[in-house]
Amino acid sequence: MKYMLSVHTCEGDVRPAMSAEEMQQSWQQITALESEMKSAGAWVFSARLHEPETATVVRVSNGEVLTTDGPFAEAREHLGGFYVINAQDLDAALGWAAKVTRCIGEPIEVRPFAGTSED
């Protein structure tokens, strides 16, 4: 079954400044985790996203398509990135989410894809 692991970040949260060496170690941990996911057949896709200010919302109103600069909702928390994974069940997906949050230090929301029971 496919799951989305959403990486949530909080605008304005001050994270400790990382030295170049610490940043390199962090990327090595993420790379190692993604390699582990790939070896286990869990990794499908992952991506980081730009800040919410770079978003554009497209919607229909009275039959007309409108675009608005900025995020869909003004909120302190926003989607910073995501993983799409294959996992046997929720417990397995939660196990991967635990590894991701340990690696990056951000909360992870785990949700199954609708309409699929395997893949």
Per-segment meaning from a language model:
Residues 1-119:
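Conserved, structured core segments of small domains
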